[in-house]
C-alpha cells in the first residue's frame, strides 16, 4: 500500500500580499495507519532567478536590496546580496526573468539557459523557483537598473572569484545565489 494524503480542511488565515493557509490533512502511511496533521502553508506564487555572467571579463552581476524577512531574523541592516529574481505573476518563467533582468540590473540579455527548478523551503512555502543563467555583455546594458518605483536595488558587477569568496565569508547568504554561483563554478563556464 502506498502513502496517501486526504485533505480535511483548507482555511485562509491571511491574503493581504500573499496567502497564508492552515491545512489539515490525513496522512495514511504505507502500513495503513492514519495520522492527522495541521500545517500553515505560505503561498507566494512561483518565481524565477537568473545569474548573469561574463566569461571574458570573469564577472557576475548581482543585486543588493533590503529583505524584511532577513531583518526580522537578525540581519542587522536587512540588506542581502543576491541574484536577480522575481515572481512569475502569470508570465512564463523565461519571460519573467527577462523582465526582471532589465528592471533590476539594466541588462537586456540574449540567450538565457534554464538550469533547474527547485523548492527552496518546502516545509512551509509553496514557491517553486526556476533557475536560469545568461552570459551578459556591456553592449546589452539598456538602463542602469535599480528596480521599479517601490524598490531600491543596487547593481553589483563583481569578479567571479570575489563572489565565491563572499559565499565563503558569509557576505552572500541567499540560497538561490549560492546555488547558481556553485553551478557556474562546477560547469566550468568561467574557466
Curated annotation (Swiss-Prot):
Claim: Iron is one of the keywords in the record: no
Domain Nudix hydrolase as annotated: residue spans: 43-180
EC nos: 3.6.1.-
Pfam families associated with the record: NUDIX (PF00293)
Residues noted as binding Mg(2+) 2 in the record, renumbered to the chain: 100, 104, 151
Binding residues annotated for GDP-alpha-D-mannose, in chain numbering: 17, 38-40, 67, 85-87, 104, 127, 150-151, 176
Needed co-factor(s): Mg(2+)
A GO molecular function held by the record: hydrolase activity, acting on acid anhydrides, in phosphorus-containing anhydrides
GO biological process, one term: nucleoside phosphate metabolic process
Record keyword Hydrolase present: yes
UniProt xrefs under PROSITE patterns: NUDIX
Binding site for Mg(2+) 1: 85, 104
Coiled-coil segments: none
SUPFAM superfamilies associated with the record: Nudix (SSF55811)
Keywords: Hydrolase, Magnesium, Metal-binding
Any Gene Ontology CC annotation: cytosol
Primary role: Nucleoside diphosphate sugar hydrolase that hydrolyzes GDP-mannose as its preferred substrate, yielding GMP and mannose-1-phosphate.
Subunit architecture: Homodimer.
UniProt free text on domains: In the dimer, the N-terminal domains are swapped between the two monomers, such that residues of both chains contribute to the active site.
Similarity section: Belongs to the Nudix hydrolase family. NudK subfamily.
Descriptive protein name: GDP-mannose pyrophosphatase
Lineage: Bacteria, Pseudomonadati, Pseudomonadota, Gammaproteobacteria, Enterobacterales
